[in-house]
Amino acid sequence: MSSKFPLGVRFITHSLPCTRLASMNSGALIYSFRSVPVLSKAFPFRLKYIGLGSRVNFSTRPERSQPEFARRSGAGGEIRASKSLIEDEAELSDWVSDLRTSSLRGKFTSDEDNADPEVVRRNVDRDTSRGPRRGREGQSDRFGGAKRGKEGEMDRFGSPNRRRTSGEPADSFGNKRLGDREGSRNGRVQGKSSESSFRGRSDRNVDSGSSFRGRSDKNVDSGSSFRGRNDRNVDSGSSFRGRSDRNVDSGSSFRGRSDRNVDSGSSFRGRNDRNVDSGSSFRGRNDRNVESGFRREPGSENNRGLGKQTRGLSLEEEDSSDDDENRVGLGNIDDLPSEDSSDEDDENDEPLIKKAASAKAVQTDKPTGEHVKTSDSYLSKTRFDQFPLSPLSLKAIKDAGFETMTVVQEATLPIILQGKDVLAKAKTGTGKTVAFLLPAIEAVIKSPPASRDSRQPPIIVLVVCPTRELASQAAAEANTLLKYHPSIGVQVVIGGTKLPTEQRRMQTNPCQILVATPGRLKDHIENTSGFATRLMGVKVLVLDEADHLLDMGFRRDIERIIAAVPKQRQTFLFSATVPEEVRQICHVALKRDHEFINCVQEGSGETHQKVTQMYMIASLDRHFSLLHVLLKEHIADNVDYKVIIFCTTAMVTRLVADLLSQLSLNVREIHSRKPQSYRTRVSDEFRKSKAIILVTSDVSARGVDYPDVSLVVQMGLPSDREQYIHRLGRTGRKGKEGEGVLLLAPWEEYFMSSVKDLPITKSPLPPIDPEAVKRVQKGLSQVEMKNKEAAYQAWLGYYKSQKMIARDTTRLVELANEFSRSMGLDSPPAIPKNVLGKMGLKNVPGLRTK
């Protein structure tokens, strides 16, 4: 009768060593067996404690010399006497004491590291043999990466490291011990020991073949090499940084090779193969859908929740609502949750406010040689070094490519440096941001350092911007100017990010300069502990785009902010226009002896002076086809086209973007219903790209600098004359030429009387090919019904706010239903009764309710 034993029982074999014969050599891998103490066989721990086991040589070069193993890897094997019980107990005691200080990593050595017995001993004790040394490339890090010059020795994952003594523990993954991770689901699964040990032993149904180079074979459940932990059903060989997700055919090797459909593959050099959604490289970049970094946290599943810290940059983990957004490729834009319902959607907008990332965002402001030649109208001959600025600031200005000042900077800087308040009227796109940032930085430099006892250092400069895009752009430019001022920090607080995240960031990072939008700044004043106290240290207050701040209804918030900062301060108001509302706020914000600087001379053209302007009048049912024809003609004439299309509302913006996407155009969209991180990414992509179309609402109308925009199309009625001018100002920036087209319906033509003084001419309609009409109709039929319904409702609400049109509500509803038919709908969508009540359109004929 056969006996059955539990799976956990292991028979105790004799302790006498087995002499190996020459015929037992296995080739490349030579296993040296020795006597195993009796207590170790009875000890209740399993493969994770392999300190008593033999060292395994994973050599791929068996012909190299191996001094330490030479005496026991020969044909004769190893002969030694059995150990006594006392020796066993002594060895066990030493091993247990090692448990307290070591990370329990399996001890295996690389052949190249075995040349010297002393080196071998030191490498085994400190677990330094993780990869082959790299010849003349300098001291290699733990995984074979060459250390770079005097940038500081790097540990195995790129963080600064000092030379350890042999007695110190050599931890990895942010000094997390392997023993701390035993609580995760990697490990024993349903009674199986799938610990992917360094002995190369495989569990049941597991083909362990993860090699020292991280190779991954077809249908191989490999025990991930180095630190890769093997999950159930994981085809993984992810080494160094590769994440091991379930059912992922991964093979991210030591050089970052990546198979298709790999969601990790973050390579040592940061290379990305197709369908790879990551690439967090050694330089600290964090691309979308990557939650990997330099530290592996204990108990993390599939390596989620990993953060990284490089050169002081702290990337927070994205929250779940951003995960859905990250799955949306920019080439195929889907609808995302509105900001109204998920205002705290994510925190991934931080890269734009970090010094390492700011240079890219600001390079568009560099006056290149071409700019200098074509933009004499706004550049002066005055150099920055003619003013008493910090040498480090001047060095950063030179690195940024600025040589001479703009007219705005030349006019405002001397007065501001004298300590006076300033109201400056200037053309859009002429360097207003640098004009107020440079003197603000000088104010920070001259301020006495905060006392060491102060837990919350004061905020010295407060910049208030009307939109998130403007705030992010201003913060990026500030970081560029602060390139050689490492002790001065810039933080940005804007809607669309979590309030606790911003609170944490301001507490842990330097924040002498704060850039904010009014609503979020008010939130911090009311809800952040100690924030109001920090604002009492403000010495410089800047209101950027002051006219726009007031147009957006922020007057009460601005008054609240002004009351929260000291009266003894210096204040700058910069604006493209100075209407009566701005003059009124001047009495509250500025001192009586403030200077008004008008950089727009009478008779000189505005930014749009070199922009060819035209308008077209067509019925609503022809607008979409007409837009398609205009775009096709412009693309045919301009290889490096860059087009911005402005729409009346966010939902109409989404509709137009969906339509153009169906027509196979390279299109992106930005509007208030998109999460802030999405808007930041798309804005940055559009800024750097060519041959691209951006469909946007008025969030991109002011101040945002997109270089080389060749065409601006405005679909529908602008809210007013100033909005038309600001939209048009996205092209023709910095002296370059551009083109603007305003597309109106016949009943919107009254708007032209407000811009009759501008050089805008009426253009005949281009011929529309019937085939183009069919393509547009087909594209509209493929747009989701919910998007059409939302666009109809938003369109109705927008034109209800236009007094000239909203006077006759019956006529307004007829026009809305005409817009509905232009989208290809037979009948207008139903609108909830409560929404109609808020619009003031209850019981109006022609509306359907639900």
From Swiss-Prot:
Cited Gene3D superfamilies: P-loop containing nucleotide triphosphate hydrolases
Motif (Q motif): 382-410
Compositional bias ranges of the Acidic residues kind: 315-325, 336-350
Residues recorded as bearing Phosphoserine in the entry: S110
Top EC category: hydrolase
Pfam families xrefs: DEAD, Helicase_C
GO MF, one example: ATP binding
PTM-bearing positions, type Phosphothreonine: T109
Reaction catalyzed: ATP + H2O = ADP + phosphate + H(+)
InterPro entries: DEAD/DEAH_box_helicase_dom, Helicase_ATP-bd, Helicase_C-like, P-loop_NTPase, RNA_helicase_DEAD_Q_motif
SUPFAM superfamilies found in the cross-reference section: P-loop containing nucleoside triphosphate hydrolases
Domain Helicase ATP-binding: 413-596
Keyword field contains Membrane: no
GO CC entries: chloroplast
Family named by the database record: Belongs to the DEAD box helicase family.
Entry text on domains: The Q motif is unique to and characteristic of the DEAD box family of RNA helicases and controls ATP binding and hydrolysis.
Official protein name in the record: DEAD-box ATP-dependent RNA helicase 26
Organism for this UniProt entry: Arabidopsis thaliana
